[in-house]
């Protein structure tokens, strides 16, 4: 399986729990697709942009 879970936007796919989903656009992806977001970030969404090596990203800074 592609570790990036890349697929057409809105298309269903099966992202594994360990998947980092760097470029995931899957509507079915239940987890955040931003590896640097802190756990439990309510605002975290697919397509957020990581800011450097910190634990902050564009959607839950």
From Swiss-Prot:
This is Metallothionein-2. Belongs to the metallothionein superfamily. Type 1 family. A divalent metal cation 7 binds at residues 50, 57, 59-60. Pfam families: Metallothio (PF00131). GO terms for cellular component: cytoplasm; nucleus. Residues 30-61 are annotated as: Alpha. A divalent metal cation 3 binds at residues 15, 19, 24, 29. The modification Phosphoserine is found at residue 58. The modification N-acetylmethionine is found at residue 1. Class I metallothioneins contain 2 metal-binding domains: four divalent ions are chelated within cluster A of the alpha domain and are coordinated via cysteinyl thiolate bridges to 11 cysteine ligands. Cluster B, the corresponding region within the beta domain, can ligate three divalent ions to 9 cysteines. One of its GO terms (biological process) is detoxification of copper ion. Metallothioneins have a high content of cysteine residues that bind various heavy metals; these proteins are transcriptionally regulated by both heavy metals and glucocorticoids. The gene is MT2A. A divalent metal cation 1 binds at residues 5, 7, 21, 24. Keywords: Acetylation, Metal-binding, Metal-thiolate cluster, Phosphoprotein. A divalent metal cation 4 binds at residues 33-34, 44, 48. SUPFAM superfamilies: Metallothionein (SSF57868). The keyword ATP-binding does not apply. Residues 1-29 are annotated as: Beta. Interacts with EOLA1. A divalent metal cation 2 binds at residues 7, 13, 15, 26. A divalent metal cation 6 binds at residues 37, 41, 44, 60. A divalent metal cation 5 binds at residues 34, 36-37, 50.
């Amino acid at each position: 399986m592609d570790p990036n879970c890349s697929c057409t936007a809105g298309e269903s796919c099966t992202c594994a729990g360990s998947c980092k989903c760097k470029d995931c656009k899957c509507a079915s992806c239940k987890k955040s697709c931003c590896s640097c977001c802190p756990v439990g970030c309510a605002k975290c969404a697919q397509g957020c942009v990581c800011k450097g090596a910190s634990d902050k990203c564009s959607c839950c800074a």
